């Protein structure tokens, strides 16, 4: 059965998944962390302050479990299609007939727009750091950041994996410094008042978005050559590290800032309670978080373009990054606006991903990664989680 499935998956391609380079477990894990960690993690404390602290813990546990299932299903979908990206998976599993190509390019357009909005938000946010540090015009900060961050992806997946690895280590160190400063200062009581169910829904949505690294899963599958154990380990560890960072940042902010938490972000609130030096450390964390997300998203988009067009990787890199810079320079919306729009699109595409996964699972007649946890009841749970996250992203917070 396994031999027959491999023949279907790798028809005329051979059994080995093709990739520009191989990733170590740490590098693959860091790509998952890098894609997930970002602006969302800094928004969680505000929403957590609007609910009892124990609600935050069970919401995080549910969001982590559903996201882990989703990521493993995506990994299996990609593995069943020889390490393909989302668009090619959709083309293989969902679309048939004369409208197949049209439907494929529509999906490509939606995913490209999602990445475009995401990366534009990273450029906008990072430029704000350069503007604050060096008093530069915003557009100059954007150009500087684009050149520095973009070159990492230009040199390929292996360099991205290495940079992600050391950036994740640096982020953990920065969070550790802030945590020690928080627990050695005057601490506030944790929130214990229930306000509204809508707040819990909004909190779930933000936590789910902060844990999401779905677009980077195919890179992991390709980077570890389809090794089942390495795929599962990298995804579980990557989402686990993101969950750990969310817990530390959230409780650190709740203890340090108390009920004075605002929508400005966790590090802004901490700087008010702990002192201005937190702003400097916070800027470093923000740059690292935004850069890891920039690398993961643009690497993914580069590969999607290359997969669909068969063009040179360097040209695909330019097509994946330059429009994001142009959109950021145009200033069509704010940093939060970019991220929110991209989040809604990304969550909605999750439903299509699960349908494609279900069809690929039936086609190959086996489940190398998810096993019984990939069966229909669990697929429905993941779809329900995606719907909840979508509703929570637009619901009013009280």
Could you tell me what each predicted segment is?
Residues 20, 139-144, 237-245, 250-264, ...:
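Loop-to-transmembrane helix boundary motifs in multi-pass membrane proteins
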Residues 1-46, 51, 68-72, 226, ...:
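Membrane-interface "cap" regions at the ends of multi-pass membrane proteins
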Residues 12-19, 138-144, 148, 156-158, ...:
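Helix-loop-helix junctions that connect adjacent transmembrane segments
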Residues 174-178, 288-297, 317-323, 342-367:
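Hydrophobic alpha-helical segments of multi-pass membrane transport proteins
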Residues 15-27, 52-60, 73-118, 131-138, ...:
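Transmembrane-helix boundary/entry motifs in multi-pass membrane transporters
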Residues 45-52, 124-138, 158-167, 265-290, ...:
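Transmembrane helix-loop boundary segments of multi-pass membrane transporters
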